[in-house]
């Protein structure tokens, strides 16, 4: 983690878990996970990157087909391992929003980047990570080893369910930009803690609040923004909004666009995703 580099030396690297999404009430299994969703968005927009992740040998064709169809750069030798893929059970509630439970780490239990993955990260100008526990451990390890020096690092803290202020600060020491999809009110003490970390460490923290807008704590520039959004009818679900938002924001920023322009692109991308019943449109699968 170091000074911001908006034009990657060798493209960006995307690092995070992918999983088997088991739609229980439909008897359907689809490739999923925040990193895979991000990869689809970046591939669609033409943003150059390499995906670092791992799946097991239980459903390799499901993932291989997705990667090939969408021309997602990856190392097959590192991506496809042995054992069970990570998985999660999804049930669609009456309000059409997904309820997720029974996450199984599979090949991510005890995960460690191989030498190729470490080299890819060490050589990249930009790195985005989707934080589940095994990824958090690796970011701390490689950050403390100096492998993030010179890279612009961003991280998706998801809905902050497994974090508190101290743990957030420990991870943000290795990160330049943090994203939090906060499900509560903007006045909650947790949000105040996000602000303290951003300004205490001189980091950028972007908090999405759904129809309540976006909070930006720019500890680097010593400013904060409250960005309103226009509430729109949700025709599908909101499950894919966060990935769409972050993908659009980062591709804009890392191509040299300003903060406000990137936020507007991200807002529009997040709104588009509310028309989908899954994290991605049906045709993506």
What feature does the model see in each segment?
Residues 2-14, 65-69, 74-79, 92-224, ...:
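Ribokinase/PfkB-type carbohydrate-kinase core domain
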Residues 8-11, 15, 20-88, 94-95, ...:
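Substrate-binding N-lobe of the ribokinase-like
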Residues 17, 21, 156, 237, ...:
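Acidic active-site catalytic centers that drive phospho-/nucleotidyl reactions
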Residues 20, 44-47, 72, 180, ...:
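Generic secondary-structure signature for well-ordered alpha-helical cores
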